[in-house]
């Protein structure tokens, strides 16, 4: 078992990483919640493997439990899904002294967390991330949000969980493409903050080797994010470094209506493209783009695409929340493991 504490004064919380944790959630929940009513949000895929198991375990430990099962995929993380969730909360007579559990990947964590933050002005929630992407990234840091038709995460808030409970064993049932999806975010951490970690990832020869080291991998990623979030909770400076690859990545996702590329695939493309553009413009010395390309290929992730309608991509980038007064902050690398923010504008991408 590994444990980290995100130190945010009265909003501090633990991240617990332990194989088999899905079978003993009640023990950890009891440490942070003394009530009896729990509402679980999950999706159809996760529910198939773990939904009833978690619900029955909680009921057997004396909790009054209701579960909502949503369709998997980014389309569910829509503003339009919220009324359905709020109505389920009302039917269950959920109060501010009760608890919500998000059992799923990044979509469920973001959507459920945002619903928790807004219903009755805030109900405590616990993250139980079941995808690699959620375990290493989206479940930590308190960013919760939903998408609008014109882009990702345009309606959201900062709302931290009471605890994050990570069981690496659940990754065994994760679809292969979503395991690769999560590896893109893992690679991102090496790119922006940890050169040694990046090159360690390059040494792994198989998925089995990655899984043999998965607790350490998750811990390293969560620890990097913990440090950044403690220094810049509200995303005004250093935390923006975590968005490496995301400016273009989010635009690619929206351009293809969130159904051609997974989030991680789009971020991988975004990481490579932004460094390649920077090298071509002479902002960075050549070399980093090829290293990123090589590791993306190693993990069977795409690194480049042809955009047929670049105007649509540029329009989406202009809506990016890092675009303030027409000044767009992008994340670049001095070298692998050394990242920095550069102020530019939309012309950078033309």
Swiss-Prot record:
The keyword Lyase applies. Its EC number is 4.2.3.4. CDD domains: DHQS (cd08195). InterPro entries: Dehydroquinate_synthase, DHQ_synth_AroB, DHQ_synth_fam, DHQS/DOIS_N, DHQS_C. Its cofactor is Co(2+); Zn(2+); NAD(+). Zn(2+) binds at residues 185, 246, 263. NAD(+) binds at residues 106-110, 130-131, 143, 152. Gene3D superfamilies: 3.40.50.1970, Dehydroquinate synthase-like - alpha domain. Coiled coil: none annotated. Its main location: cytoplasm. GO terms for cellular component: cytoplasm. Keywords: Amino-acid biosynthesis, Aromatic amino acid biosynthesis, Cobalt, Cytoplasm, Lyase, Metal-binding, NAD, Nucleotide-binding, Zinc. It catalyses: 7-phospho-2-dehydro-3-deoxy-D-arabino-heptonate = 3-dehydroquinate + phosphate. Binds 1 divalent metal cation per subunit. Can use either Co(2+) or Zn(2+). Pathway: Metabolic intermediate biosynthesis; chorismate biosynthesis; chorismate from D-erythrose 4-phosphate and phosphoenolpyruvate: step 2/7. GO terms for biological process: amino acid biosynthetic process; aromatic amino acid family biosynthetic process; chorismate biosynthetic process. GO terms for molecular function: 3-dehydroquinate synthase activity; metal ion binding; nucleotide binding. It comes from the Bacteria. It is found in: Cytoplasm. Catalyzes the conversion of 3-deoxy-D-arabino-heptulosonate 7-phosphate (DAHP) to dehydroquinate (DHQ). Belongs to the sugar phosphate cyclases superfamily. Dehydroquinate synthase family. This is 3-dehydroquinate synthase. The lineage of its organism: Bacteria, Bacillati, Bacillota, Clostridia, Eubacteriales.
